[in-house]
Amino acid sequence: MPRRPINKKRTLLPDPVYNSVSVHMLVNRVLKSGKKSVAYRIVYNALKEIGDVTQKNPVEVFEKALDNVTPRVEVKPRRRAGAIQMVPRVLRLGDRARANSLRWIMEACDKRSGQPMVTKLKSEILDAYKKTGFAIRKKEELHKIAIANAMYAKKPQVIINAINLLVD
């Protein structure tokens, strides 16, 4: 029995404007130095500009972009026989996969320079929606590593099938 108490999972409330938990998670990722009102303003302005550009519901565009970036597998380093191997495992479409995709989108925003954060966030979400950009490359790179190291997984065929579902 573990001695440490098990932490209960916190439930996130949806954001007040779009009533979406994913938008609230994005706001928490944009947040710096505890200035949540600034984070809300950045995200809402970016979503408003996305709605103006695409003429679609900005939350649906954002959700589709997040689905495009969300990985289906992850790799964990394991030490076996004196060597460190990257062992892939399947990710269910849950908070961990969603957190990775949001992290990659924010990293992509940080790599863009010379623009305000609203423009960088809008551009990266639109790139993810079109299946281009840094975050999509990061996901594809992770999937290539997982396929290359599938032999180290307990069930290699499950890893390959999870990645091939994306291609179809």
Swiss-Prot record:
SUPFAM superfamilies per the UniProt record, alphabetical: Ribosomal protein S7 (SSF47973)
CDD domains referenced in this protein's UniProt entry, alphabetically: uS7_Chloroplast (cd14871)
InterPro entries: Ribosomal_uS7, Ribosomal_uS7_bac/org-type, Ribosomal_uS7_dom, Ribosomal_uS7_dom_sf
Keywords recorded for this protein, A-Z: Chloroplast, Plastid, Ribonucleoprotein, Ribosomal protein, RNA-binding, rRNA-binding
Compartments reported by the entry: Plastid, Chloroplast
One Pfam family linked to the record: Ribosomal_S7
Keyword Signal: no
GO cellular component: chloroplast; ribosome; small ribosomal subunit
Predominant place of localization: plastid
Function: One of the primary rRNA binding proteins, it binds directly to 16S rRNA where it nucleates assembly of the head domain of the 30S subunit.
Subunit-level organization: Part of the 30S ribosomal subunit.
Designated name of the protein: Small ribosomal subunit protein uS7c
Gene that specifies this protein: rps7
